[in-house]
């Protein structure tokens, strides 16, 4: 059963996306459909949604029933979506790079250290699982991945504990892994759970989340219309750095000119973006109180000007 999902920074996303009737929007990470539904409700526009998680198809079908002519869903990850989109172009594109509540809250999905279940973490249900990760990789590789993708300073201690544990028993549940991590670095009441960074790192690695983001950005220009907006909500410093650098590398400030001029002057034809949010937006204190998972969110937006 799908759990209630609260779209992070929804009001901010709608404000910068600025949906208009008759326009087309791409929701790259459908999840429980929060962004797609809100965009459809905002005006008489059209939405195409993508997701590689087969568990969201039922929710997509529900939205399709209410918006038969204005909503379509494609079961794919966004990095591999270009061929399936068949040269469609969009007035706005939204990416929410976080793991959804419907994944975290279902124990059998194996994403959460708060709910004991099979150690899986695969968004698509296919490929290399988290259980295989902790039971087969060398200690150094485990440590390097936890450090790189989780920014975990105790990565080597955690990796050593994982390897020591698996000598006597297979690590096959989220509960086992969480306890191994907690016991290796200690648990202090009131602090963020010690297992947080390790679970995050393994999830990012298992699903190639950063690679998928980079592959998508390489081609996003082709599916974004002129004046279209790219809106990205990230939850990890590495994700945000990729987005920040991509915007910076592909954007250029306009030359100072008359306020009566209508068009932007482009010095370099390869600079096709205009950054809308010079500084990443963060969720309000109120939203964080209502949804603690929003605490690390950052929103960046840019507009296509070529």
UniProtKB/Swiss-Prot annotation:
The catalysed reaction is: cytidine(1402) in 16S rRNA + S-adenosyl-L-methionine = N(4)-methylcytidine(1402) in 16S rRNA + S-adenosyl-L-homocysteine + H(+)
Answer whether the UniProt record assigns the keyword Lipid metabolism to this protein: no
Q: What InterPro entries does UniProt report for this protein, alphabetically?
A: RsmH, SAM-dep_MeTrfase_MraW_recog, SAM-dependent_MTases_sf
One GO term in the molecular function aspect is:
rRNA (cytosine-N4-)-methyltransferase activity
Cite the Gene3D superfamilies for this sequence. Answer: Putative methyltransferase TM0872, insert domain, Vaccinia Virus protein VP39
Entry GO terms, CC: cytoplasm
Q: What compartments host this protein?
A: Cytoplasm
Q: What is its EC number?
A: 2.1.1.199
One of the Pfam families matching this protein, by short name: Methyltransf_5
Recite the UniProt keywords alphabetically. Answer: Cytoplasm, Methyltransferase, rRNA processing, S-adenosyl-L-methionine, Transferase
Principal localization? cytoplasm
List ligand-binding residues for S-adenosyl-L-methionine: 33-35, 51, 82, 96, 103
The Gene Ontology biological process annotation of the record reads: rRNA base methylation
PANTHER family, sorted: 12S RRNA N4-METHYLCYTIDINE METHYLTRANSFERASE, S-ADENOSYL-METHYLTRANSFERASE MRAW
Name the family the entry cites.
Belongs to the methyltransferase superfamily. RsmH family.
The UniProt function text for this chain reads: Specifically methylates the N4 position of cytidine in position 1402 (C1402) of 16S rRNA.
Protein name as it appears in the record: Ribosomal RNA small subunit methyltransferase H
């Amino acid at each position: 059963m799908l759990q209630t999902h609260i779209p992070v920074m929804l009001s901010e996303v709608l404000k910068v996306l600025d949906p208009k009737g008759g326009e087309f929007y791409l929701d790259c990470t459908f999840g429980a459909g929060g962004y797609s539904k809100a965009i459809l409700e905002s005006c008489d526009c059209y939405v195409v949604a993508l997701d590689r998680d087969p568990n969201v198809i039922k929710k997509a079908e529900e939205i399709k029933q209410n918006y038969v002519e204005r909503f379509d869903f494609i079961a794919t990850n966004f990095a591999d979506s270009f061929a399936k989109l068949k040269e469609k172009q969009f007035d706005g594109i939204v990416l929410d790079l976080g793991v959804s509540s419907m994944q975290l809250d279902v124990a059998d999905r194996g994403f959460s250290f708060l709910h004991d279940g099979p150690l899986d973490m695969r968004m698509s249900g296919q490929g290399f699982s988290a259980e295989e990760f902790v039971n087969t990789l060398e200690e150094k590789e485990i440590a390097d991945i936890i450090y790189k993708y989780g920014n975990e300073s105790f990565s080597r201690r955690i990796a050593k504990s994982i390897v020591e544990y698996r000598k006597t028993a297979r690590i096959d549940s989220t509960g086992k892994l969480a306890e191994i991590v907690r016991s290796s670095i200690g648990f202090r009441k009131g602090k963020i759970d010690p297992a947080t960074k390790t679970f995050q790192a393994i999830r990012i690695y298992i699903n190639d989340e950063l690679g998928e983001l980079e592959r998508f950005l390489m081609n996003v220009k082709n599916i974004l219309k002129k004046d279209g907006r790219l809106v990205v909500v990230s939850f990890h410093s590495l994700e945000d750095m990729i987005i920040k650098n991509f915007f910076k590398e592909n954007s250029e400030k306009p030359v100072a000119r008359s306020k009566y001029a209508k068009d932007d002057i482009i010095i370099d034809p390869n600079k096709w973006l205009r950054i809308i949010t010079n500084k990443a937006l963060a969720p309000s204190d109120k939203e964080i109180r209502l949804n603690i998972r929003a605490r690390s969110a950052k929103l960046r937006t840019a507009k296509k000007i070529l």
